Amino acid sequence: MLKIKRTWKTHSRILDKDPFSIEPPRKVIRALYDYTARKATEVSFAKGDFFHVIGRENDKAWYEVCNPAAGTRGFVPVSHFEEIGKTVKSERDSDGSGQISFTDLTTNSSTTRSSISELHSGSQPLFGIVQFDFAAERPDELEAKAGEAIIIIARSNHEWLVAKPIGRLGGPGLIPLSFIQLRDLKTGAVIKDVSEAVLRISCIPRVEDWKRAAADYKKSSIPLGKFSDGETQTMPSLSPSTENLQINNDVTYQAATDNSSTFPGSVANELTPLQTLESRTASIASKNKKDMSSEPTVVAAMVENYMIRDDQYWYLVRAVMSDGKHRNLCRYYEDFFNFQTKFLELFPNEAGRGDERRVIPYMPGPVDDVNELISSQRAMDLDVYLKEMCRLPARLLENELVKLFFLPLDGDVESPHPTSTMPEALPREPLSFSLPEKAPEKATNISIPESAPTTAGSTCKVKVRLGDETFALRVPSDISFEDFCERLTNKLGECEHLSYRDTNANKVLPLNNVDDLRKACSQESGVLLFAERRRF
């Protein structure tokens, strides 16, 4: 594990090497109240936020904490938190025998308890918390420590499961069911009736089904990009511990995974409708081309979670930029796919197509079907992909393709400090990239998708600054003032004191009616709107 440097420029900006790496937590705590930082070394938080205590755990006044999800580090007041972490309670059965029960916590979810009937309402994947240290005695078993989070991939029988670690790199392996506290992947709810849950939830396949998924995935798990005739590409070698995974000495299957990222059946083809990248690029108006030279480069990035909107899965990307700002971005699988395809074409040597060793990381290729279990694993694979991407040489990260991928689009969030504000998943065309005919490493022609197909001049892009955060939305140019306020309320909540920047007069003017709105939208530079959240 990479060690975090103990210095930082601001209270919430970490780190020079890897802002999302953390030291092993000594405690896990949850906020009881809201708190706004008063010094540069403090961290702001809201009620219900979780932190890892990494220092001064016995101090009566201040904890030194790290939030691995948001990438923040600093000091918080002890009086504002309750300690959760991992506890051990000794209970006595009716026969007097001692029984040890363990409780643990998923640090970035609000844990709720639900009945087994609620779990059966949909095909929801499971993850688990390892309750006891498990020492692998065979190559096909999964070495795991108490408190480690794992995702359940398949079931062998009523005693053994196939699982893969979440918080670290590693392939799948066998682990006893009795060593795991199962939880619902989305809600974090503990599944108390383990046997019924494992047998009845359809998203946990049997080993035979997973074997077929492994074979399908192995066929499709190829590096994205084009290869000329006669070119070959070396695939990552299989992990020795998972290359031949044998269950109960009677079922053996090939796991198409290595120790770095992927897992059988973890990706799906979402490129619908089927179009070429060139046709997508040609359909975007040239007025949307953007000069990326002034854009900051990405310092660190992660895929924190996945969501679903209108039957389409999208991924929450958190990024830290070279200017110190934090971005929460909505990205679809097509965005990753299009980016990787063109990135490999733009840098063929770094893609391993010449004599040099490949340095561009692999990402999961498309397969036929998408479900919640596949999307959860894909989120982890893409998380590894982005973290490996951020370790590339600066000349690659400074390329315009990379800058565009992390550029805030309509609905995305940008803030000078880490924020839990979620981006809005707006309907739009996938990110498209077109390569220049000459000097590919110096410039790229990049097209930014619009939220929806519109005619030129029919929409107005509005940036809204609310405190330290900036939001973006696109509205029809002829929208009424009432409808505009309604859309603003739906996105940001009740706001007041609306104003906008008049670029011609170089001053801030009030936005009170439709005439003010029309004047603001007529500016060539777009609209910068200022708002204050209403205080009740």
UniProtKB/Swiss-Prot annotation:
One of its GO terms (biological process) is regulation of conjugation with cellular fusion. Residues 88-115 are annotated as: Disordered. Residues 24-86, 123-185 form the SH3 domain. Pfam families: PX, SH3_1. It comes from the Eukaryota. Residues 101-115 have a biased composition (Low complexity). Keywords: Repeat, SH3 domain. This is Protein scd2/ral3. SUPFAM superfamilies: CAD & PB1 domains, PX domain, SH3-domain. One of its GO terms (cellular component) is mating projection tip. Residues 293-413 form the PX domain. Scd1, scd2, cdc42, and ras1, in its GTP-bound state, act cooperatively to form a protein complex. Required for mating and morphogenesis. Interacts directly with scd1 and with cdc42. May bridge and facilitate scd1 and cdc42 interactions. Residues 459-533 form the PB1 domain. One of its GO terms (molecular function) is phosphatidylinositol binding. InterPro entries: Bem1/Scd2_PX (IPR035550), Bem1/Scd2_SH3_1 (IPR035548), Bem1/Scd2_SH3_2 (IPR035549), EF_Hand_1_Ca_BS (IPR018247), NADPH_Oxidase/PX-Domain (IPR051228), PB1-like (IPR053793), PB1_dom (IPR000270), PX_dom (IPR001683).
